[in-house]
Amino acid sequence: MILSTTPTLEGKTIREYRGIVVGEAILGANVFKDLFAGIRDIIGGRSGAYEKELARAREIAFDELKERAAALGANAVVGIDIDYEVVGQSGSMLMVSISGTAVLV
């Protein structure tokens, strides 16, 4: 599966547009509790534990995006956009949302 943030793929011709696809992952409040408990991981203003959880959420969202594109018969996703949103009561959860257009090249 080819993934790209650009609307076209250099050297490839988009033969068919299959539709918009989305992948999402939400980190719950317990993750943030664990992250803040591990505040000692912060070195130089960065939290290794927090970054690891964000990477895991991104991976889950990308996997979901690819599964949905494949279900539409696509072999690529173009125009990918990644958004991070704080959601839930008093910002207790973080949502990673990835969207793009499933295409056949």
Swiss-Prot record:
Q: Which SUPFAM superfamilies match?
A: YbjQ-like
Kindly name one Pfam family recorded for this protein: YbjQ_1
Taxonomy, superkingdom: Bacteria
| Regions that span the bilayer | none
Q: Which NCBIfam families match?
A: PRK02877.1
Q: What is stated as this protein's family in its record?
A: Belongs to the UPF0145 family.
UniProt-listed HAMAP family: UPF0145
PANTHER family membership = UPF0145 PROTEIN YBJQ
- Name by which UniProt lists this protein: UPF0145 protein AHA_2580
Q: Which organism is it from?
A: Aeromonas hydrophila subsp. hydrophila (strain ATCC 7966 / DSM 30187 / BCRC 13018 / CCUG 14551 / JCM 1027 / KCTC 2358 / NCIMB 9240 / NCTC 8049)
